Amino acid sequence: MPKIYRIKGKIVGKDEPMVFTKEYKAMKEEDAIEKIYSEIGSKHNVKRASIKIIEVSEISADEVQDPILQAVL
């Protein structure tokens, strides 16, 4: 059964650091982290070394804030 992960981090190396919080549905924590590296790297044209993960936490379906993820659940 997939779990829901909230990932907090920042992108360094640009003009000013960008802070982000994303929620993903994944089987393992590693899969969610891989997904964030892939998505942010492609959208913001940054390398994985510039993406710093601050916190990864597993959350319940009630705690989801992303409206798209809420619609899927």
Curated annotation (Swiss-Prot):
It comes from the Archaea. The keyword Ribosomal protein applies. HAMAP family: Ribosomal_eL20. The keyword RNA-binding applies. InterPro entries: Ribosomal_eL20, Ribosomal_eL20_dom. Keywords: Ribonucleoprotein, Ribosomal protein, RNA-binding, rRNA-binding. Pfam families: Ribosomal_L18A. GO terms for biological process: translation. GO terms for molecular function: large ribosomal subunit rRNA binding; structural constituent of ribosome. Part of the 50S ribosomal subunit. Binds 23S rRNA. This is Large ribosomal subunit protein eL20. SUPFAM superfamilies: RplX-like (SSF160374). One of its GO terms (cellular component) is ribonucleoprotein complex. Belongs to the eukaryotic ribosomal protein eL20 family. Signal peptide: none annotated.
